Each structure stands twice: as structure tokens, then as C-alpha cells.
Amino acid sequence: MGYPGVLPVLNEAVLASAVKLGIAINGKIASESKFDRKQYFYPDLPKNYQISQYDLPIVQHGALEIELADKKTGEVQRKTIGITRLHMEEDAGKLVHAGSDRLSGSTHSLVDFNRTGVPLLEIVSEPDLRSGQEAAEYAQELRRLVRYLGISDGNMQEGSLRCDVNVSVRPVGQEKFGTKVEIKNMNSFSAIQKAIDYEIERQIEALENGAKIVQETRLWEENGQRTVSMRSKEGSSDYRYFPEPDLPPIEVSAEQLEQWKAEIPELPAQKRSRYETQLGLSAYDARVLTDDREVAEYFEAAVAAGANPKLVTNWVTQDIAAYLNNNKLTISEIALKPEVLAELVNLIEKGTISGKIAKELLSELIAKGGSAKELVEKKGLIQISDPAELEKIIDELIAANPKEVEKFRSGKTNVKGFFVGQVMKKTSGRADPKLTNQLIDKKLQG
């Protein structure tokens, strides 16, 4: 906050987080690094300098692989994005513009200093991204990492994860990059993609019309779906970096590095690979399951309890996911334990209940918990799989509906659905669907 006499102290937790994230992005961890003062005058920085790292960051030369799914074919392509550095610094304040929902129309600005001085990690990426889609996926993969590592919840809407982008264009065949423009104020992954795509088109159009691109900082306006000029962009020399005199250099010993390495869990990319190779899941399903660490752990617990991985995947990514979305819950907040989901899936596989009955029980199990088997027995929902019992019901229906039988035998095979529906109605949905269809086919064709 810039109070006279206040001295900075390094938060040990941020150093551990920086090193763990550095390992996760395959970076080189510096055995020695230091802090520097970054000088600039702006309302969100009360002491007019920011404690950051300049020439000796904690992590350098990393890389992160992203997966790009083709929306039409579903095919997944992988691309490696280089990471220049990861460094520690303190956060600045937040400007709040009043009088309009846009900066360009606001009457005045307020400064929220609540996050000032809070430690953060900043990642600088190599110019390997070529589209808004790639950048958005890259940001999402970084969010997965910080969530798995327990560094942050990664919520962009709350500012836990923030992203600035630099965009430049160049003619096909030209090696030198064009003038870069920085874009700020993107609080969602879709905003990142849209802002980049808009800025690419803006710069191309400007160059084709003979205009020049100036180095500046622009703001993404969500309502206007456009970028607007904010201020000219400073160069590194404008910040007048010099070593932070109030913080000593940082040393990371080999022993400490090994300890932090041992604390790193299985990361999203490793989980995805294991799910595909060992559990036989598709790349898409593996990706959906590993997007949230809690969901992945829930899935693995259900599989460990003896359930078929592919069947559990369907329930977790479809029915349970829909319930969570509709009720704005996380998977840790539901009463349905993974072992009970495994029990429910196994009841379907054994033919004890139908998938339809299982879906009807799901909401109650999610809300109240309990045993799936006991609930089935209590409600009398055990599937009827006795051919003799089903044949008796089907014979009665055929005898009572001769006109429908005649329609079927004259070629109107869709009439079969009528008989299936009647069997389900008489058995309160407990008839084995597969066996019911087989027996009806046999009776009607006979």
C-alpha cells in the first residue's frame, strides 16, 4: 500500500507454488533468483513500483502441450507451446470504472486496493499461439494445472486467473513479427478467444488499408465485442528495473526441490494418457473427466469399487454432470458416494434393474445417498427377467389387440413400439427391455 517504513516479506507458500508449477510446465528451476523493482506510475500502484522478477526469474524455458479438438470430426491434435519464464511478483489494485459499463463512456474510476501486495505468479509464453482457439485452450490447460496443484481455484470471473495477450500479424512468408498490441480485460476463456480473433482481423484490415499498427495497450469491451485503445505500451526500459534492496536473493536447495517434486500429484495430461491407454476411454471422455480434479478422483473411486470404467464415464459425464450444472453444485457436494454409483452401475450390468429405472433412482441417491441395492429392493424395482413371466404378459396383450397384430404382420412394424410400451406399463417399467423386445418379435412374427 506504500505506507512509510513498511518492508516486504517473501511468502514461503508462493515460492513452493512457483517451483511446483515450474516443474509441471517442464521448466528449469533456478537454484538462485532474485526480486526487482518495476517502476511505473499508475493509479492501481500506490507506491509507484511493483516488486517483481526481471533478469533472474524462478523458472525459465518451460513448455506445455495443449490438445485441440476438431469440432466436426472430434479428432484431437496436440501442440506444444513454449514458456519463456515464470516469475513471482506482487499484485496491484483493481480499477473500477463508474458511470458506464464501458471504459470509453465512464465518468470516473475507483481503485480497489484489497488485492494490493498479494503474491501472484506470472507466466510469459513464447509466440507459438496462432489463433484465439489455441490461446483459450492454453489458458484452460494452465487453469487445470493450478487447480490440480492446489495453487488457485483459477476462476477468471473472480480474478484468480488473469490473462493479457499480445497480438501481432505479419504477411505470409515474412519472418519478422509485426508490431504487437497488448489486450487486457478478458474475464473468460470465450472472451480471450473472441478478443484475439477480433484483434487479428482489426490489424489485418488496418495494414491492408495502408495504416500502421502502433504498440499500445487495448481493452476488450465485452458488450461491444471489440477492442478499444487504452494507453501507449511501455517497453522494458521504461520500467527502470533495479534489484529489490529489501528482499534477499532466493536459494532453492536440491533437497527442497526433491521434496516439492514428491508433493506433485498426477497431472491432467498424465491422467488423460492413463485413462486412454489403461481404461480404454476415448480422448474426449478422458479430457472431460480430467478437467476437474475432484471429478477425476470421484471417477477413479467408482472404478476402484469394481464398476466398468466406460459405463461409469457415461454416468459421470452425462447424468451426474447435468444434475450438477442444473443445481450449481460440485461433485463433492452430492450425497451419492462413488462406491454407490459403482453399485448402481453393477446392478444394471447384472440385469437387476434397467437403465431407465437407474436414471429414476439417480436423483434420490444424489440428494439423500444410501445404498442403491437397498433402494431398489425397498421400492420393488428389481427387473423382471423371467421369460415365462414376460411371455404371459405379452400373450395377454396380443390376444387383447388383434388389430395391432394384423397391422404389424401387414408391414407396419412400428406397431411393435405399442406392445413394448404396454409391457412396460403393466410392469411399471421393470421389464427387461432387451428380453422384452426379443419376445415381442418372436410372438408377433409367429
Task: State each model region's role.
Residues 413-446:
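Short, amphipathic C-terminal "tail helix"
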Residues 17, 21, 199, 302, ...:
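Amphipathic alpha-helical segments in well-ordered regions
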Residues 206, 323-327, 354-356, 372:
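Short, structured loop/turn "capping" segments at alpha-beta junctions
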Residues 331-342, 346, 355-425:
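Strongly charged, low-complexity linkers/loops
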Residues 159-171, 276-298, 309-327, 339-341, ...:
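Core structural elements
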Residues 256-263, 270, 300-307, 341-353:
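Extended, non-catalytic structural segments that build the interaction scaffolds
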Residues 1-266, 283, 304-308:
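Basic, nucleic-acid-interacting segments
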Residues 280, 303-312, 352-353, 410-414:
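Structural motif
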